[in-house]
Amino acid sequence: MNKMEAVRPDDRSEDQARTQAHPLTGNEAIARGAWEAGVKVASAYPGTPSTEILESLATYDADEVNAEWSTNEKVAVDVAIGASFQGVRALAAMKHVGLNVAADPVMSQTYVGVNGGLVLAVCDDPGIHSSQNEQDTRLFCRLANIPVLEPSD
């Protein structure tokens, strides 16, 4: 291939595709960060604005990350907590109202702790673009004693 020919994504190796700079959405960046941090189990319940996190993680090699849709957000959190109890780094993704569904295991887990890393990626929906309500997850996390990393410019 000469220098003038374009490289289609299909022509690149997986390593080349991951190391070349290209813009990412916020959800893709969360997935990439999880993969780079060694997350091996990812579970989620689909709901905008968080759906693309698991969809992006599912594009990585299945031997590297087990990405699965769950029946609901509580089940997604249970899967991630179970993996973290076994020393595996895990992630559960959901939208803000899904955190309400997962409240029981989340509130209990924060006092039990984990053996592997555990990340809950919860996407709020300010302005109610695709949800039935607007809530501030930071307040929920404060109640549950969960540290919060908040994206900014």
Where are these regions (language model features)?
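A near-ubiquitous, low-amplitude feature marking generic local secondary-structure context
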Residues: 13, 17, 25, 40, ...
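A short glycine/serine-rich beta->alpha loop
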Residues: 17-24, 39-41, 65-70, 146-149
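Homeobox/homeodomain signature
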Residues: 14, 20, 29-32, 84, ...
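Sparse, context-dependent recognition of short Cys/His-centered cofactor- or disulfide-binding micro-motifs
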Residues: 15, 24-27, 103, 131-133
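N-terminal glycine-rich anion-binding loops that anchor highly charged ligand groups
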Residues: 22-56, 78
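Hydrophobic, small-residue-rich alpha-helical packing segments that form membrane-like cores
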Residues: 2-7, 19-25, 108
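Thiamine diphosphate
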Residues: 48-142, 147-149, 153
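Generic N-terminal amphipathic, Lys/Arg-enriched alpha-helix
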Residues: 5-19, 34-40
